[in-house]
Amino acid sequence: MGFDSVKVMENWQSKTSNENEKKKKKRRRKKNNNVRNSEHYEEEANGCWVKFRYIVCCASSTSDVETSLTLSTSTVGSQSAIVQSNDQPVGPVSSTTTTSNAESSLSTPIISEELNIYSHLKKFSFIDLKLATRNFRPESLLGEGGFGCVFKGWVEENGTAPVKPGTGLTVAVKTLNPDGLQGHKEWLAEINYLGNLLHPNLVKLVGYCIEDDQRLLVYEFMPRGSLENHLFRRSLPLPWSIRMKIALGAAKGLSFLHEEALKPVIYRDFKTSNILLDGEYNAKLSDFGLAKDAPDEGKTHVSTRVMGTYGYAAPEYVMTGHLTSKSDVYSFGVVLLEMLTGRRSMDKNRPNGEHNLVEWARPHLLDKRRFYRLLDPRLEGHFSVKGAQKVTQLAAQCLSRDSKIRPKMSEVVEVLKPLPHLKDMASASYYFQTMQAERLKAGSGSGSGRGFGSRNGQPVFRTLSSPHGQAGSSPYRHQIPSPKPKGATT
């Protein structure tokens, strides 16, 4: 073999060796890519676990959550600014409605600068809360809200570790739905307000969890759920004395926020679904995601985007965006009216002219001869006549169109204090017989029965529903019967 032939052979062997080496590298790269793809798939699968949970538990959250949308101040003054129905957020027609979550996601929050850590709050790990709620299983689901799903769980009384169901401390774990209508900003507000504000009529925040994109809040468990459930979902009505006890407790909670807290707070989202009840029907305010600091001394109001629930928001706040403590007083008046009548603040299932509770009730509030037409027919006379008169007068003051005329919440508390203990039941008086006769006469004359009818001689309470076919959402949906009115039988 000549020199040239040897050189060609060496070149061919070198080329073959290089090609083989390239093939080996290509195979190694392909193998590594497969490994990375497998790892990525596993990460996706793990990440989807939480998403799957939200899909299972919160599939209907878009339609029936009770949350708060924002109203652009450019639409203030427009009479058509609000067209939403009961328990639907205040929002504009002509401008773009954005969620508070959008506001929260505009920039990545710096947790260390925004989150105020309070020594009495417990920091839970996500895995502990996952185990405490039994893997967020559907049987532990208490309900849904704008923030996300709420689950029942059990943890150590003096720690954060999960314990066997029925032992330790019973808690309600609220999870942040990444696709929900409330976001990180509201999560922070909950911690920063409830972590600092301690009062018997505010729900107790036990702790929180923040890991990666997980945001959870842990509250004391409220066994009797929300006032909304008892007013609009139960087969048995709340007795009059219990209604007055709840009204007094809720008033004390607002009074504390407005007049007793070191830094006064405007609640901004007072409604029946945010009033939770413990085992003794003590009222506790929950959901501080929309709360705002009251105006500084020397200022009359806080200017802010309009946020809240339609039917509860004060008219001057909706029109101007000027927020004061008297805005909360108006909302309290709406809830007081709901407790008095057994009707929702907004209900399009009612006859024309009765959709808006406040507007329907105004003519009756200050008329001593007509106020009884407001009373929940399911009470069947088991209410205090003097108490009912006081409540209607108080509701009228709270619902005054002039915010300056509305009372302070401390004044509301003083009016309500004696009402749970009054014993002058209407059913035991001649007054009640006259009232019933007038009511039946008015009902037969109008054809609508003022929103109530009878079946087998007994009053029938109309079943209410939201525009989406449900009666509105609440963070608690327990099947706990309401107490019976005195003298009632099953």
Swiss-Prot record:
It is found in: Cell membrane. CDD domains: STKc_IRAK. One of its GO terms (molecular function) is protein serine kinase activity. Residues 463-473 have a biased composition (Polar residues). Pfam families: PK_Tyr_Ser-Thr (PF07714). Phosphorylated by SD129 in response to the pathogen-associated molecular pattern (PAMP) 3-OH-C10:0, a medium-chain 3-hydroxy fatty acid. One of its GO terms (biological process) is lipopolysaccharide-mediated signaling pathway. Keywords: ATP-binding, Cell membrane, Coiled coil, Kinase, Lipoprotein, Membrane, Nucleotide-binding, Phosphoprotein, Plant defense, Serine/threonine-protein kinase, Transferase. Residues 444-454 have a biased composition (Gly residues). ATP binds at L142, G143, E144, G145, G146, F147, G148, C149, V150, K174. Residues 94-103 have a biased composition (Low complexity). It is a lipid-anchor. SUPFAM superfamilies: Protein kinase-like (PK-like). It catalyses: L-seryl-[protein] + ATP = O-phospho-L-seryl-[protein] + ADP + H(+); L-threonyl-[protein] + ATP = O-phospho-L-threonyl-[protein] + ADP + H(+). Residues 23-33 have a biased composition (Basic residues). This is Serine/threonine-protein kinase PBL35. It comes from Arabidopsis thaliana.
